Amino acid sequence: LPGARCAYDMTQTPASVEVAVGGTVTIKCQASQSISTYLSWYQQKPGQRPKLLIYRASTLASGVSSRFKGSGSGTEFTLTISGVECADAATYYCQQGWSSSNVENVFGGGTEVVVKG
């Protein structure tokens, strides 16, 4: 029906991960239906607004370190952080973002990255 809204669920794993400085973190996001490459990744630190890291699944946002890499399409997506630094400690969210007015923008549940010094 015109104007009908589609329900999209975004399942993000793991909920929390601990990593040593210099290590690698992999965060996965699964969409309940294909969203092509309309997937963004955000980093949020306590008391701060979310920072866009990656859009269209794999495109690095301006000013973001190339240590962050996004991949995937359809229903399966991955964010990889390599050479982890203390400053990477944060909560990371995936967001589906079809450029269509009849689909809700939906976030994953978030992944807390704890960096061990």
UniProtKB/Swiss-Prot annotation:
Start and end residues of each stretch annotated as Complementarity-determining-3: 95-106
Biological process per Gene Ontology, one example term: adaptive immune response
InterPro entries assigned: Ig-like_dom (IPR007110), Ig-like_dom_sf (IPR036179), Ig-like_fold (IPR013783), Ig_sub (IPR003599), Ig_V-set (IPR013106), IgV_Light_Chain (IPR050150)
Region (Complementarity-determining-1): 30-40
Family annotation (Gene3D superfamilies): Immunoglobulins
Disulfide bonds listed in the record: C29-C86
Chain residue ranges for the region called Complementarity-determining-2: 56-62
Start and end residues of each stretch annotated as Framework-4: 107-116
Region (Framework-2): 41-55
PANTHER family: IMMUNOGLOBULIN LIGHT CHAIN
Additional free-text comment from the UniProt record: This clone was derived from the rabbit-mouse hybridoma 12F2; the chain produced is a monoclonal antibody against streptococcal group C vaccine.
Protein name, entry field: Ig kappa chain V region 12F2
